[in-house]
Amino acid sequence: RAYEPTPPPLDRLIGLQGRVIRGFDRSGLVRLGSELWQAELVEGSGPVSTNDVVVVESTRGLTLTVYRQTDEL
């Protein structure tokens, strides 16, 4: 039987910074390293503009929950 590695949990992304691809009010795309991720803003955070820095607060499925780095939570 072949070894099937378990993909790493997305929890490793929590706390990482990413950049907004195109500004959005509720959901949109962010770049973390070389990868693009679907993201939703933390309630009460945003809107964000293109190239804003966001921080990953949590994950839900393959969607990241983020807040703008300058927002205070």
Give residue spans per PLM region.
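Short aromatic-glycine-enriched beta-strand elements
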Residues: 25-30, 62-65
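A generic structural motif
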Residues: 14, 21-24, 58-60, 70
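Hydrophobic, low-charge alpha-helical segments
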Residues: 1-12
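Beta-strand/loop nucleic-acid-binding surfaces
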Residues: 36-47
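Conserved positions in beta-strands of structured domains
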Residues: 19-21, 42, 55-57, 67
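Residue "hotspots" at secondary-structure boundaries inside conserved domains
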Residues: 10-11, 22, 46
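Short, compositionally biased
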Residues: 66-73
